[in-house]
Design a protein with these regions (language model features):
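Flavin (primarily FAD) cofactor-binding/catalytic cores of flavoenzymes
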Residues: 1-51, 99-216, 220-462
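Flavin (FAD/FMN) cofactor-binding and adjacent substrate-gating region
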Residues: 65-98, 263-271
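Tryptophan-centered motif/residue detector
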Residues: 55, 86-89, 118
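Residue-level signal for pocket-adjacent positions within structured domains
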Residues: 63-72, 81, 188, 313, ...
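Catalytic cores of transferase enzymes with a strong primary signal for eukaryotic protein kinases
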Residues: 21, 27, 59-66, 71-78, ...
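Glycine-rich phosphate-binding loop and adjoining beta1-alpha1-beta2 segment
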Residues: 54-70, 253-257, 287
C-alpha cells in the first residue's frame, strides 16, 4: 500500500451530499467575492466514497416530491442572487416558465436530485469521488492543534494524506433496521427500493410484499409497489392505528427557520426535549396527507370491486422472520390480542427510517479528544465546531449529527444554505484572528496560507 502526502487545504470536507455540497457552493461564492478585494480565497477539497454524486437514489420514485419548499435549496436562503439556486437551475435547463406554470413549491424528488447533480458538476474541481476518509489526526504544536491530517483511501489501494486547517464531516444518514434484521436479496431497506425492484425482472411475478413502517418512506413504498405490481398483494404493517399526517402548518414550520436554531441551541436541555417532542410530527413517522388519502382511496375502491390487494395491518408488528428458498416468511402479531398471522411473501421491505451516521467513525483515535455532554452526546458549538480537549487554531466541524444541539432541522434540507454560510464565516473569522495574532515568545507563528504544507516535524496525537 502506497502512502503519499499531497498539498494542504484551508478546508477538507468528508462526504459530498447536500450538506457539504451547500458548503462547497458557499466557499465558491465566498472566493468570488474576496477575489476582487485582493484577499486570499479559501482552498478546499471534498472527499466522497461513492463513485458519483447521488441523493436518495433508491427512492427517486415517480411523482414523489420533496417535503420542503424549493427555496430551501443550496443557496437561496443565504444568497437569493446565487447562480447555484434552484431557480438558476431551472433557467439553465429551460424550464423556468414551465415550473412557474406548475404552481407548486415542492418539486419532484427526481428533479431536485438532478438539481443537486447539476450543482455538483459545476463544482467537480472541488471533489474527489471514490475516496473514503479513514482517519483525521490532529497536528499539535506547542500543545495547540494547528491543523489536521486527513487520511484518504482510494480503490487503487493508494492512501493519500492531506493537511487541512478545517475539516467538515458531513457523514449523512444511514438506513436503520430493527435489531436482529439483516439485509438480503429478500429483506430490503426502502433506501434501496428501485435497484432491488429492477433485480426482480425476469423472475416469476411477485405474489406478495410486506412493507414495515408508518412514515413517509413506508407509505411511498406501499403506493409504489401497488402501482408497479398491480396483481401482487401488498401488506402494510405498522404499530400505529393508522398513518399519521405530517404537521406542515405555517406556525409549526417556523421550527425550521434559521433563527429557530439560535433559539433551540441556547435553550435549557429540558426545553430542548420539550420542543423536540412537541414537533416530532413534522418529520418522524408521519406521512403527507395527500398520500394518506390516496392510499385510503385505494383500499376503499378495492373493497368496492371485491379485489383487495392492499392490506393494512395496523396495530401490528413483525415478531419473527425466516427466509425461504424463494422468499421470506413473516410472522405478524396483532398487538391488541396477540394473534399471529403468517405471511408467505416474496420480499419484505423495512421502511424504518434513517439514523445520523456516527461522525467519529472517521476520526480514528482522535475521537477520544471529543468532549461529550452528560448524555454521552458530542459537545458541539453553535457554529457546528466540535469541542475538543486540546485547544486549537484549527477547526473540526460536524453537520447532520447535531439534532440534540441545533434542533430538528439538523438532518434536513431546511438550513443547508444558511448553515454553509455560518461554517464559512466561522472559518474565515478564525483565519482573520490568526492573522492578527502575534506569536508569544518561543512559539512558532501560525500564518494562514492558501496551501498548508505538510510539516514532518510536527508532533501528531497518538
Amino acid at each position: 500500500m502506497e502512502t503519499t502526502r499531497g498539498s494542504g487545504f484551508d478546508v477538507v470536507g468528508v462526504g459530498f451530499g447536500p450538506s457539504n455540497l451547500g458548503l462547497a457552493v458557499a466557499i465558491e461564492e465566498h472566493n468570488m467575492a474576496v477575489g476582487p478585494a485582493g484577499r486570499s480565497p479559501l482552498t478546499s477539497m471534498f472527499f466522497e466514497r461513492r463513485p458519483t454524486f447521488g441523493w436518495h437514489s433508491g427512492m427517486l420514485l415517480p411523482n414523489a416530491t420533496v417535503q420542503v419548499s424549493f427555496l430551501k435549496d443550496l443557496a437561496t436562503m443565504r444568497n437569493p442572487a446565487s447562480t447555484f439556486s434552484f431557480v438558476a437551475y431551472l433557467h439553465d435547463q429551460g424550464r423556468l416558465a414551465d415550473f412557474i406554470n406548475h404552481k407548486t413549491l415542492f418539486p419532484l424528488r427526481f428533479e431536485f436530485n438532478d438539481y443537486f447533480a447539476w450543482a455538483a458538476d459545476r463544482l467537480a474541481h472541488l471533489v474527489t469521488y471514490a475516496s473514503e476518509v479513514s482517519e483525521v489526526r490532529p497536528v499539535i504544536e506547542d500543545g495547540v492543534i494547528t491543523a489536521f491530517d486527513v487520511t484518504v483511501g482510494r480503490p487503487t489501494k493508494q492512501v493519500d494524506v492531506r493537511r487541512a486547517r478545517n475539516v467538515v464531516i458531513a457523514a449523512g444518514l444511514a438506513p436503520h433496521l430493527p435489531d436482529g434484521v439483516t439485509r438480503s436479496d429478500r429483506v430490503w431497506h426502502s433506501s434501496e427500493l428501485l435497484p432491488r425492484v429492477e433485480e426482480l425482472a425476469g423472475e416469476r411475478p411477485p405474489r406478495r410484499f410486506v412493507v414495515v413502517g408508518a412514515g413517509q418512506s413506508a407509505a411511498e413504498t406501499t403506493e409504489f409497489l401497488c402501482q408497479r405490481f398491480p396483481d401482487a398483494e401488498v401488506c402494510a404493517v405498522f404499530s400505529r392505528f393508522g398513518y399519521s399526517p405530517s404537521d406542515d402548518s405555517s406556525f409549526t414550520n417556523g421550527i425550521f427557520d434559521p433563527s429557530s436554531v439560535d433559539t433551540f441551541y441556547s435553550a435549557p436541555e429540558d426545553v430542548k426535549q420539550m420542543l423536540s417532542g412537541y414537533h416530532r410530527n413534522t418529520n418522524y413517522s408521519v406521512v403527507d396527507s395527500e398520500l394518506i388519502d390516496a392510499l385510503y382511496r385505494r383500499t376503499y375502491m378495492e373493497k368496492v370491486t371485491g379485489r383487495q390487494l392492499l392490506r393494512i395491518m395496523n396495530a401490528s408488528r413483525v415478531v419473527d422472520l425466516a427466509e425461504t428458498s424463494d422468499g421470506v416468511l413473516a410472522f405478524v402479531e396483532f398487538l391488541p390480542d396477540g394473534e399471529i398471522t403468517r405471511l408467505d411473501a416474496d420480499v419484505i421491505v423495512y421502511a424504518t427510517g434513517y439514523r445520523p451516521s456516527d461522525p467519529t467513525r472517521v476520526l480514528g483515535r482522535t475521537a477520544r479528544l471529543c468532549r461529550r455532554d452528560g448524555a454521552g452526546r458530542l459537545s458541539i458549538g453553535r457554529d457546528h465546531r466540535l469541542d475538543l480537549t486540546i485547544p486549537g487554531r484549527a477547526g473540526l466541524f460536524v453537520t447532520g449529527a447535531s439534532e440534540h444541539a441545533h434542533g430538528l432541522s439538523a438532518t434536513l434540507l431546511s438550513n443547508v444554505a444558511v448553515r454553509a454560510g455560518e461554517l464559512v464565516e466561522s472559518m474565515v473569522a478564525e483565519t482573520i484572528d490568526l492573522t492578527a495574532e502575534s506569536p508569544s515568545e518561543g512559539q512558532r507563528p501560525v500564518t494562514p496560507t492558501r496551501h498548508l504544507k505538510a510539516q514532518p516535524s510536527a508532533r501528531e496525537a497518538s
